[in-house]
């Protein structure tokens, strides 16, 4: 079975001018995935469950594992000579690696270090999301905010690690999506899901229906559409919502479905972060044949206006996302 290391080397060989910088970053992400996997698996036996007593920049209570994952990722990336800077959902501002090595590096990383961390206490799957861009500021100087405020269509790689019944690393560099499952007996990620493709049609819809009364009319209509019986379109669809973006998206990637986190009266701009969640997940979805929008626009074409900008997210199987968007457009003026 092909290992992640072998796969990275093999893919790099396809590009004669490649210098191995992106491969080095992916190797660091592989290492931090092992570290976070190890600590999540013993979370109930050590003092890293529960809240830390600290709020992040979003005003949300940080879990102890949020901080652990954030610090682990920052340390792993700072050790790489290819990384010029780092931005995390857990930090108010970006971090410029202001050393000679960092100033001469080409890439920046954005991450949600531990998505769905509130689920850890009840032993539900969580994940790490990452996004990689080439910097746009001059090489030789520290990175600037401009480097991080790029639209998602400028990503050179994105991916996630899902920590569940098994730990999987799924990523794309713009040439398809591949998944690697961690074998703890040998300490290696092995290629288990090659050239992943999201089904064009799906039967699963994932949304927090407890917020139904606060949703836009287009979302309400789509939920009703999913629940109606119609043999021709294989409805009613199945409702599955874990509450962890990575876990919900991963299931729908494999089986076909739509994940929706819309705007609502209590969060009119949506709740997920464009740079840390929306863009990397949208890049993966499109590379696997899926679609990702904010209900009206392609996620990857949105020009960011703030480091922690929020966005509604409709992502998944092409036919399902397009149907949801059709219903959103119907009520656009309301």
Swiss-Prot record:
Binds 2 magnesium ions per subunit. Belongs to the FBPase class 1 family. It catalyses: beta-D-fructose 1,6-bisphosphate + H2O = beta-D-fructose 6-phosphate + phosphate. This is Fructose-1,6-bisphosphatase class 1. It is found in: Cytoplasm. It comes from Haemophilus influenzae (strain 86-028NP). The lineage of its organism: Bacteria, Pseudomonadati, Pseudomonadota, Gammaproteobacteria, Pasteurellales. GO terms for cellular component: cytosol. Pathway: Carbohydrate biosynthesis; gluconeogenesis. Its cofactor is Mg(2+). Mg(2+) 1 binds at residues 89, 112, 114. PROSITE patterns: FBPASE (PS00124). Mg(2+) 2 binds at residues 112, 115, 277. Homotetramer. Substrate binds at residues 115-118, 208, 241, 271. Its EC number is 3.1.3.11. GO terms for biological process: fructose 1,6-bisphosphate metabolic process; fructose 6-phosphate metabolic process; fructose metabolic process; gluconeogenesis; sucrose biosynthetic process. CDD domains: FBPase (cd00354). Keywords: Carbohydrate metabolism, Cytoplasm, Hydrolase, Magnesium, Metal-binding. The gene is fbp. InterPro entries: FBPase_C_dom, FBPase_class-1, FBPase_N, FBPtase, Fructose_bisphosphatase_AS.
